[in-house]
Amino acid sequence: MNSASAHDLRLLEVDKEKQDPKSPRGALEACLTRCSISSASSSSDDPPPNREAIDNADADTDVQCKNHRASSNWGKFFKLWKRRSMKRLSSFPPLSGAAPPIIKQNKSADPNMNGMVLHDIYDFQSSLQNFSISDIEIATDNFSPENIIGRGGYADVYQGILPEGKLIAVKRLTKGTPDEQTAEFLSELGIIAHVDHPNTAKFIGCCIEGGMHLVFRLSPLGSLGSLLHGPSKYKLTWSRRYNVALGTADGLVYLHEGCQRRIIHRDIKADNILLTEDFQPQICDFGLAKWLPKQLTHHNVSKFEGTFGYFAPEYFMHGIVDEKTDVFAFGVLLLELITGHPALDESQQSLVLWAKPLLERKAIKELVDPSLGDEYNREELIRLTSTASLCIDQSSLLRPRMSQVVELLLGHEDVVMTPREAKIKMMQRTYSEELLDSVEYNSTKYLGDLDRIREVALAS
């Protein structure tokens, strides 16, 4: 595939997404269409559009644009979101010496989005709440640093409590240019509004006053990371760890195979797994998530984003992102559940590199978290260790799919591919596999790559 055909393929995919009301772009395009109709009818001497024309713009979507002033403001959001989509075209590496497309960036985005009302634009579902900035400030004690429970590339996450006693997590976009913040907000909003599964975080509303905020339901337990590596670690019995592993795997199967379009999360880690009151895991933070069209085997990205310790080799070597990127990160998460160790310790020691020799020797007693003592199910421990070993394989081709991971965790070890599946997988031997096969990859190079990425991240 040359760069021109890749470019054309992405343009075709964009057009298809515009026609699909169940995709983020389809929903946003429908809203923008209605906004344009409303704007044109209010500023023209021509007769207003008939009811049928307006209904067509709303057909098969939950999007509604009711207020002209709000529509005008959100129109700026949509244009920035669309521009960001076009920027992704440049992620295809040019071949045959072709020059990459030049995308001009508008640096004059209007950052003043105060007073915009969510329900004037969207009516995703009846339970979606439109929070005011005062609601959010009261809930988080004016964004007190003590209430920070997570940090990301563009945002901080605060825990809060509403007047009725409901706990919430507030993701507040604080970093980047106004354009970048807007793009990140719309990208994540476009995904989470279409995600609904017991093992994904419950999105309950937004606040677009005084900045951009996404609000999620939170339980007193907080995140897996805070329990696993914090003072409340004793609460995580083996049975709970095993159920967290299985529930998180179910959530990833939903994202990869159960959604209308494949979703690659790209930032699976202990801090991004919320736990409900009964210790059920919920995947959260879709800020880095990508929709992967069915025509494509992978995305190529030029900007490294995510969390050190969870990067798959093909990602930080070649910028390749697909379902197996999440599988690798899930393997690291399994190791955290087994060992109680973080993905990177205080000395920057990689959990993967520490655990691999023990996995190869099947030294499970040396792997298991000492705080558990002998209070674990040996059969389940063997399942988790063997599955983790497969998930963190250097070769993305040799890693299982998440649906296979679930079967392995359940003890269905006779997971085999049909001849057709095997043939498809042989045909899909890409790019990530061929590039990894072309170099000898070892622990020293792994650490060297991590160091280089760390230097780039700190310098940017």
UniProtKB/Swiss-Prot annotation:
<dbReference type="InterPro" id="IPR008271">
    <property type="entry name" value="Ser/Thr_kinase_AS"/>
</dbReference>
<dbReference type="InterPro" id="IPR001245">
    <property type="entry name" value="Ser-Thr/Tyr_kinase_cat_dom"/>
</dbReference>
<feature type="active site" description="Proton acceptor">
    <location>
        <position position="267"/>
    </location>
</feature>
<protein>
    <recommendedName>
        <fullName>Receptor-like cytosolic serine/threonine-protein kinase RBK2</fullName>
        <ecNumber>2.7.11.1</ecNumber>
    </recommendedName>
</protein>
<dbReference type="Pfam" id="PF07714">
    <property type="entry name" value="PK_Tyr_Ser-Thr"/>
</dbReference>
<feature type="domain" description="Protein kinase">
    <location>
        <begin position="143"/>
        <end position="415"/>
    </location>
</feature>
<feature type="modified residue" description="Phosphothreonine">
    <location>
        <position position="307"/>
    </location>
</feature>
<dbReference type="GO" id="GO:0005524">
    <property type="term" value="F:ATP binding"/>
</dbReference>
<dbReference type="InterPro" id="IPR046958">
    <property type="entry name" value="RBK1/2/STUNTED"/>
</dbReference>
<comment type="subunit">
    <text>Interacts with ARAC5 and ARAC10.</text>
</comment>
<dbReference type="GO" id="GO:0005634">
    <property type="term" value="C:nucleus"/>
</dbReference>
<feature type="compositionally biased region" description="Basic and acidic residues">
    <location>
        <begin position="7"/>
        <end position="23"/>
    </location>
</feature>
<keyword id="KW-0418">Kinase</keyword>
<keyword id="KW-0067">ATP-binding</keyword>
<dbReference type="InterPro" id="IPR017441">
    <property type="entry name" value="Protein_kinase_ATP_BS"/>
</dbReference>
<keyword id="KW-0597">Phosphoprotein</keyword>
<dbReference type="InterPro" id="IPR000719">
    <property type="entry name" value="Prot_kinase_dom"/>
</dbReference>
<keyword id="KW-0808">Transferase</keyword>
<dbReference type="GO" id="GO:0004674">
    <property type="term" value="F:protein serine/threonine kinase activity"/>
</dbReference>
<feature type="binding site">
    <location>
        <position position="171"/>
    </location>
    <ligand>
        <name>ATP</name>
    </ligand>
</feature>
<dbReference type="GO" id="GO:0051020">
    <property type="term" value="F:GTPase binding"/>
</dbReference>
<keyword id="KW-0963">Cytoplasm</keyword>
<feature type="modified residue" description="Phosphotyrosine">
    <location>
        <position position="315"/>
    </location>
</feature>
<dbReference type="GO" id="GO:0005737">
    <property type="term" value="C:cytoplasm"/>
</dbReference>
<dbReference type="GO" id="GO:0106310">
    <property type="term" value="F:protein serine kinase activity"/>
</dbReference>
<comment type="similarity">
    <text>Belongs to the protein kinase superfamily. Ser/Thr protein kinase family.</text>
</comment>
<feature type="region of interest" description="Disordered">
    <location>
        <begin position="1"/>
        <end position="67"/>
    </location>
</feature>
<feature type="binding site">
    <location>
        <begin position="149"/>
        <end position="157"/>
    </location>
    <ligand>
        <name>ATP</name>
    </ligand>
</feature>
<keyword id="KW-0547">Nucleotide-binding</keyword>
<keyword id="KW-0723">Serine/threonine-protein kinase</keyword>
<dbReference type="InterPro" id="IPR011009">
    <property type="entry name" value="Kinase-like_dom_sf"/>
</dbReference>
